[in-house]
Regions:
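Short catalytic/metal-binding and nucleic-acid-binding patches
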Residues: 1-153
Length: 153
């Protein structure tokens, strides 16, 4: 099948014209492929959390903030700090995180005998540029309350 830009074009979820390597705070949601609840498995949850905690070793210009694991998705807040020599974009950071976690989790699930295909995360992710402290506190509150109200997403 040939590529048809009219048929195969996916609308970008990123804000048009925005430089996602700019310093600032970002709220990100990533969902599992098919919304499968693999994150309910304690070992899988630990893998996802451990790789999250190690992310600043790979990207020294980031600061981790809130992070929550739900059965079929995760939320986190990430801060990008200014650095004139190394400015990864939000997509680069999220892509690396998705790749590292998918490889580790799929390997673990295969050793357990759980079949989940070759894709762990949905291809895209959702982001929100956090504009001020009030918004940051509101999103932190949302993340803290999400396990109490899993139907919020």
């Amino acid at each position: 099948m040939r590529y048809d830009p009219e048929k195969h074009h996916r609308r970008s979820l990123r804000l048009k014209g925005y430089d996602y390597s700019r310093p600032g705070a970002y709220f990100v949601t990533m969902c599992l492929q098919g919304r499968e609840p693999f994150l309910e498995i304690p070992e899988v949850c630990h893998i996802v959390e451990d790789i999250w905690k190690a992310l600043p070793q790979r990207f020294p210009t980031i600061e981790l903030d809130e992070f929550i694991v739900m059965p079929d998705h995760i939320h986190f807040i990430l801060h990008l700090h200014p650095d004139h020599t190394h400015r990864p974009t939000l997509s680069t950071i999220v892509g690396a995180y998705k790749s590292l976690t998918a490889r580790a989790v799929l390997s673990h699930l295969r050793t357990r005998g759980d079949i989940c295909g070759n894709q762990f995360w949905q291809e895209r992710f959702y982001d929100h540029i956090i504009c001020n402290e009030t918004e940051l506190f509101a999103i932190r509150s949302y993340i803290h309350k999400n396990p109490l109200n899993p139907g919020l997403l």
